[in-house]
Amino acid sequence: LDDTAMTYTAFFTHGTDLDSRWLITCDHATNFIPPFVNGGDLGLPAEDMERHIAYDPGAYGVARALGEALSAPVVASNFSRLVIDPNRGEDDPTLLMELYDGTIIPANRHADEAELNMRLNRCHRPYHDTVAELAARREDTIIVAIHSFTPQLRGRPPRPWEIGILYPDGERLSPALIDMLAAPGALTVGDNEPYTGYLPGDAIDRHGTA
């Protein structure tokens, strides 16, 4: 193994010494492929690795800025969602994608159980262990998960929202935030759009609503 593989960590953290009820997470922060995953290459051209299928463009920068604004800790993944998706439960069939938005992921097509478990142990589980550790430091922790979404999936209608606030049923902060952001002349806000804020086993379900 090269030095990168030996020193690799599955997450970035910032401000972990801050005592804040806020915790900022970024599940899809990077398009990085660790060298122990198919030699650091999933078989996709560079232009596909820059698409939303590989990560959430811009999300990490927003997470860092929000962490600074709130004086809150930030934890972000250090692996592409195509390696293994940290925003999926371990039993979710989309945990390791073979086809995403019309693009075949060559290195994932024949990944066996041993490969899946290796990616879980090297990437997915260490990231979630860190989120869980930071979330458990206070009883009143509020997790804000930062994502970005593509304006249009292939073969689908355009998404008109400039920002989406996603949340599970019964959550109280998000509706007030939506009202503020959607004030006249402000933003086009998706209320649990472009997708629902509750997916069983996802990162928020695991750490924020358990």
Where is each model-derived feature located?
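N-terminal catalytic or cofactor-binding beta/alpha core of small enzyme domains
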Residues: 2-143, 148-210
